[in-house]
Amino acid sequence: MVIKPRVRGFICVTAHPTGCEVNVKQQIDYVKAQGPFHGPKRVLVIGASTGYGLAARISAAFASGAATVGVFLERPGEGNKPGTAGWYNSAAFHKFAEAEGLYASSVNGDAFSDAVKQQTIDIIKRDLGQVDLVVYSLAAPRRTHPKTGQVYNSTLKPIGKTLRQRGLDTDKEVIKENVIEPATEEEIANTVAVMGGEDWQMWIEALDQAGVLADGAKTTAFTYLGEKITHDIYWNGTIGAAKKDLDQRVLKIREQLAARGGDARVAVLKALVTQASSAIPMMPLYLSLLFKVMKKAGTHEGCIEQVDGLYRDSLYNDHPIMDEEGRLRADYKELAPDIQAEVAALWDQVTDENLYELTDFKGYKSDFLRLFGFGVEGVDYEADVNPEVPIRNLTQV
């Protein structure tokens, strides 16, 4: 069938298998061009199919020669219905890893569940023995608690005040003001339950108890801090409450791993177009401005540049780039005072008329479609493609 993009709000409901494969190949080519680094050899990535998690898997495998186990929740293509981008990304990753003799195994299921944790542990025990790095890169709208069965939904809201903030309606391509009511205490608690550090901690405890964490094993979870412009909706809002929970829980996890020479760190990455970030009301406008300013400065980076740099500069470097809270920082180019000042200066100047002139909304749209395998150079989008692409060595839970 011929697959075209169908966008609904902040999600594209179709994905292109060939486009996704080329995307993955370009990321592999990038990390190889940076040369190998002395990094992890057996890696578990929780949330491995898109965005930063996928980049973490690619960099570990193709620049450090790691065997990888990936956990994700994606949908395969069936009949004339395309699968999700994450499915096609993972199929491509497996294909390229296998071609180079790199071990790759994946688990498709709910990472919050005990069943998926157990299945993952069984695979590690059987095939790898242990892992020396666990990357936690999960973005999910809801979580069923594995012990109580309670379902929590996350919300994107400010805390303690109504927020009036400029935003960009990406469908209509107009600037509009978003009015967002503050979260209730229950909404805050639910968001922390979904996006905080409890599940990360549960994973590490389960892996540790099963004896599949190697001596000296490291773990990292990804976060975003941002600057003043994004603080009200992000760092000082419900998502921020969840991210602050990560900062608390990492201390306990670090203590647990340090006993055997290991370490646990929260890693701060830059703002990027991902399926997760496009859902945040003011993010498309912020990103469109940020892209414009950073590209002009020559400091713009995508997922793969960020994560590959995180491995080389911090996770596997004797002199990691770290802040006073002990977080690894890969977002310093975004937060450079001159970059932020220019974004802030342009923020109120953007109108419907000058949107394409003052911002890089064109680049934003292009990056958004690329997430789903569209608008990738060298791909024939009129060609017939089979939406059913198998993933070898996949366990369905």
Curated annotation (Swiss-Prot):
Catalytic activity field: a 2,3-saturated acyl-[ACP] + NAD(+) = a (2E)-enoyl-[ACP] + NADH + H(+)
Entry keywords, A to Z: Fatty acid biosynthesis, Fatty acid metabolism, Lipid biosynthesis, Lipid metabolism, NAD, Oxidoreductase
Residue ranges of coiled coil: none
Pfam family, any one: Eno-Rase_FAD_bd
Keyword field contains Ligase: no
GO annotation terms (biological process): fatty acid biosynthetic process
Active site: 234 (proton donor)
Pathway in which this enzyme or protein is active: Lipid metabolism; fatty acid biosynthesis
Cross-referenced InterPro entries: Eno_Rdtase_FAD-bd_dom (IPR024906), Enoyl-CoA_Rdtase_cat_dom (IPR024910), FabV-like_NADH_b (IPR050048), Trans-2-enoyl-CoA_reductase (IPR010758)
Enzyme Commission number, as recorded: 1.3.1.9
Catalytic EC class: oxidoreductase
One GO MF term attached to the UniProt entry: NAD binding
Positions of substrate binding: 224
Binding site for NAD(+): 47-52, 73-74, 110-111, 138-139, 243, 272-274
Source superkingdom: Bacteria
Residue numbers marked as site, Plays an important role in discriminating NADH against NADPH: 74
Family: Belongs to the TER reductase family.
UniProt subunit comment: Monomer.
Record function comment: Involved in the final reduction of the elongation cycle of fatty acid synthesis (FAS II). Catalyzes the reduction of a carbon-carbon double bond in an enoyl moiety that is covalently linked to an acyl carrier protein (ACP).
Name of protein: Enoyl-[acyl-carrier-protein] reductase [NADH]
Name of the gene encoding the protein in the UniProt record: fabV
